[in-house]
């Protein structure tokens, strides 16, 4: 284990620490899935730490453990994490902190809290990633496990602490360029693969009765409700920004009018041989307006885009099932009439 740690430290110093893909052990995936589904029953957000090491620009996640619930005020989270990693080290388990994971809310993981947490992780542990598990989509039979890292532009913007429209334009940052998705693969040991093959033979054959189930009741409703809420939030942000622009325009108009008046007065003073008044005296009367924070609006736009993509994907699948069901029903009715 010490050799692994030394190898990892040397690689961290010599390379640029970029991650090409994430390799996750099946045991770590099962732990994450179990924790996220347990917390989803209580409508809580599940979060935990990822342990592993970096090998040739591949981030290997070999273990994980959950964070304590935020409601427990007596629990010191930092001390808890250090204690767990120390005990894992004693039993010769990979204990290097390489990131964190969390469950997803209605298929949308982008949030201000996620951005802040990943920024602190990535600035302290450069190769760290955040793994997001979508409980709702996975419960319908589609394993949804994605890994993300902040882009260099997003990290630079957070370091500067400048979230004005000018900063977004200068760094060319939008909701689509806040995070970069890293490919993730799941790897099992040969013994696990053999066991899975044997278990697959013991399972009864699925007749596929639920393949044409539309299932539009809750999924589409939740996505539409979340989409409407995000659109309302974006509208409020747009109203605030429009008010800011109106105030800035009004202030600029008054400043130009005052400067023009001062220029005329200075011309009269010059003709009379009197000293002129500097323009700084007028400019000091108009303090520059503080530009609003556009980070919230950018994140909300990303959430709207994600919800729209999920709704479009879900509707396209449901429409395909609907047409197939209609054809089968017509064929069944035609057969019965004969």
Curated annotation (Swiss-Prot):
GO terms for molecular function: metallopeptidase activity; translation initiation factor activity. Pfam families: eIF3h_C (PF19445), JAB (PF01398). GO terms for biological process: formation of cytoplasmic translation initiation complex; positive regulation of Notch signaling pathway. GO terms for cellular component: eukaryotic 43S preinitiation complex; eukaryotic 48S preinitiation complex; eukaryotic translation initiation factor 3 complex. It is found in: Cytoplasm. Keywords: Cytoplasm, Initiation factor, Protein biosynthesis. Residues 22-154 form the MPN domain. SMART domains: JAB_MPN. Its main location: cytoplasm. InterPro entries: eIF3h, eIF3h_C, JAMM/MPN+_dom, JAMM_MPN+_peptidase_M67A, MPN. Component of the eukaryotic translation initiation factor 3 (eIF-3) complex, which is involved in protein synthesis of a specialized repertoire of mRNAs and, together with other initiation factors, stimulates binding of mRNA and methionyl-tRNAi to the 40S ribosome. The eIF-3 complex specifically targets and initiates translation of a subset of mRNAs involved in cell proliferation. Component of the eukaryotic translation initiation factor 3 (eIF-3) complex. The eIF-3 complex interacts with pix. Interacts with mxt. Belongs to the eIF-3 subunit H family. PANTHER family: EUKARYOTIC TRANSLATION INITIATION FACTOR 3 -RELATED. This is Eukaryotic translation initiation factor 3 subunit H. It comes from Drosophila erecta. The lineage of its organism: Eukaryota, Metazoa, Ecdysozoa, Arthropoda, Hexapoda.
